[in-house]
Curated annotation (Swiss-Prot):
Protein name, as recorded: Mediator of RNA polymerase II transcription subunit 7
Disulfide cysteine pairs (residue numbers): none
Glycyl lysine isopeptide (Lys-Gly) (interchain with G-Cter in SUMO2) crosslink residues: K185
Cross-link Glycyl lysine isopeptide (Lys-Gly) (interchain with G-Cter in SUMO1): residue positions: K185
General function of this protein: Component of the Mediator complex, a coactivator involved in the regulated transcription of nearly all RNA polymerase II-dependent genes. Mediator functions as a bridge to convey information from gene-specific regulatory proteins to the basal RNA polymerase II transcription machinery. Mediator is recruited to promoters by direct interactions with regulatory proteins and serves as a scaffold for the assembly of a functional preinitiation complex with RNA polymerase II and the general transcription factors.
Record-linked InterPro entries: Immune_Mod/Transcr_Coactivator (IPR051669), Med7/Med21-like (IPR037212), Mediatior_Med7 (IPR009244), Mediatior_Med7_sf (IPR044888)
Residues modified to Phosphoserine: S194
Length: 233
């Protein structure tokens, strides 16, 4: 009889797969195709599993005796199992002291193993609840972060509005107002308008220099106001 095959807890090194998925192989269509979906059973960590198995399998399906009833309180049963493990461990120590070679030692070890299996099984039954709570907490954190971001944005918006209002209040009353002719006409242009535009080009060129000077004066006045605001304590 050969020696039992050692099963590694880690997957095999991926180098044998990386060499097959080079850029050249992918472009030429020579890269191996993904394996087909598993339909029946598969091996994981040396154990065989069925695809339709439950995530948390019942104890009876694993050939393990159930120590608690079908309807029970998880918290109460976990406390009882914890106390039973402690008592059985003390009994095992007493057996090791009095008669180390007794058969009762193996019985106590099996009892402890069964108790630990039940503890892990009850803890695993809390996994769906733990996943829901983790998702709930994560969504609450995201909601709080978004609300804080919106609040900071609102504060910055109010500050900008206040600064603009202060700038408008600080402007002197004798600044020249923008002329109505500077507004851009957005309506569709007909044939008469296009003819009028050709006649108005020369007049607009004459006024463009004067308007440019006015815009420069306004920019200079705004720069002076901003400098004065920055110098204020």
């Amino acid at each position: 009889m050969g020696e039992p095959q050692q099963v590694s807890a880690l997957p095999p090194p991926p180098m044998q797969y990386i060499k097959e998925y080079t850029d050249e192989n992918i472009q030429e269509g020579l890269a191996p195709k993904p394996p087909p979906p598993i339909k029946d059973s598969y091996m994981m960590f040396g154990n065989q599993f069925q695809c339709d198995d439950l995530i948390i399998r019942p104890l009876e399906s694993q050939g393990i005796e159930r120590l608690h009833p079908m309807q029970f309180d998880h918290k109460k049963e976990l406390r009882k199992l914890n106390m039973s493990i402690l008592i059985n461990f003390l009994d095992l120590l007493d057996i090791l002291i009095r008669s180390p070679g007794s058969i009762k030692r193996e019985e106590k070890l099996e009892d402890l193993k069964l108790l630990f299996v039940h503890v892990h099984h009850l803890i695993n039954e809390y996994r769906p609840h733990q996943a829901r709570e983790t998702l709930r907490v994560m969504m609450e954190v995201q909601k709080r972060q978004r609300l804080e971001t919106a609040e900071r944005f609102q504060k910055h918006l109010e500050r900008v509005i206040e600064m603009i209002q202060n700038c408008l209040a600080s402007l002197p009353d004798d600044l020249p107002h923008s002329e109505a002719g500077m507004r851009v006409k957005t309506e569709p242009m007909d044939a008469d308008d296009s003819n009028n535009c050709t006649g108005q080009n020369e007049h607009q060129r004459e006024n463009s220099g004067h308007r440019r000077d006015q815009i420069i004066e306004k920019d200079a006045a705004l720069c002076v106001l901003i400098d004065e605001m920055n110098e204020r304590p």
